Amino acid sequence: MIYPGRGASLSVAVALVLFSSGAPWTFREEKEDVDREVCSESKIATTKYPCVKSTGEVTTCYRKKCCEGFKFVLGQCIPEDYDVCAGAPCEQQCTDHFGRVVCTCYDGYRYDRERHRNREKPYCLDIDECANNNETVCSQMCVNTPGSYRCDCHSGFYLEDDGKTCTKGERAPLFEKSDNVMKEGTCSATCEDFHQMKMTVLQLKQKMSLLSSNTEINKQMTNEKMMMTTNSFLPGPPGPPGPAGTPGAKGSSGSPGQMGPPGLPGPRGDMGPIGPSPDLSHIKQGRRGPVGPPGAPGRDGMKGERGFPGPSGPPGPPGSFDFLLLMMADIRNDIAELQSKVFSRPLHSSFEDFPSAPDSWRDTPENLDFGSGEDYKSQSPPKSSRKRKLPRNLKNPDWPV
């Protein structure tokens, strides 16, 4: 698919928009843009709209496009119903593809993209069918022609009707010349020429008989004449296209297309050679200045791992037994209240029911100097105090065990 240039190129470029200041800008399009279009004689509509530059200044910008009912083809604004192939812009075949010119080559020709890119003609080159025997299938000789080929036979052979097969011998003549001897200066015709003219007249009559208005001519056609007009004398399929004509004059170059998108970044190049070392002898170095104030403290770091346990400390002083006695007294009061609620009668209870703590259990100035452990065990009370019996009033049967 190719798109050659055609005629004088009309620059419908957007460069006029940026000629004012050359600074980068942005635009703000409004709804009234359609009403501001002005169509010129070249069918190019110019639209004005406000735009804002990068500096914040509001200015007027212009945008160009084809007027309504026109389309942009090969740098020109032409009517939408205009045939772009009317001026024969292509070398061989032209197709209107939605307003674009599509040039193709005939059968038997190939399109050379490089020649067309360099604007060299002809860019539709002939295909040598004889170079590949599988395409021609000629039994003996193949002769390449512009856009096609033909088969020939050696001496003593003749070409069959298929145009490819050669048969040994000579072809028998289909028609012989008339035996009538014509005088010099007169026209003579062979039987073959006469037969062809007769068949042509019969074919014309057959076509006319198909028309509804020519009923009388249809009646005059006999069965014998209808039998003679067989399919063998009907016109055959169209032949291959003829050779290409001489190329025309070179047209003017078209308008430059729009700038394409930027390509992908290329690979990073190799590092260049290291330059010479700088000369620092001319740089003066003074005395180092004072140390500045410390900066702001940084953020707290992550919590560290737990350290190893430290050594065991010395034993502490012995504990007091008074707290345990108070707790037992509270439990006794709770039990007494529970019994009074269950049995509905008061029970005898006194603080004397509990044995008093031995003097050796109380905190004395002598015991405060001792710590826990073996040192405290050495100060155990005498056996007489440890075997002290409980009073008999604790053997009350009403006391729950």
From Swiss-Prot:
This is Collagen and calcium-binding EGF domain-containing protein 1. Residues 126-167 form the EGF-like domain. Its main location: secreted. SUPFAM superfamilies: EGF/Laminin. PANTHER family: COLLAGEN (PTHR24637), COLLAGEN AND CALCIUM BINDING EGF DOMAINS 1 (PTHR24637:SF396). Keywords: Angiogenesis, Calcium, Collagen, Developmental protein, Disulfide bond, EGF-like domain, Glycoprotein, Repeat, Secreted, Signal. Belongs to the CCBE1 family. Residues 235-244 have a biased composition (Pro residues). It comes from Danio rerio (Zebrafish). Not expressed in blood or lymphatic endothelial cells, correlating spatially and temporally with the migration routes of endothelial cells that bud from the PCV, migrate in association with somite boundaries and seed the horizontal myoseptum region from where lymphatic precursors later migrate. Glycans are attached at N134. Residues 1-22 form the signal peptide. It comes from the Eukaryota.
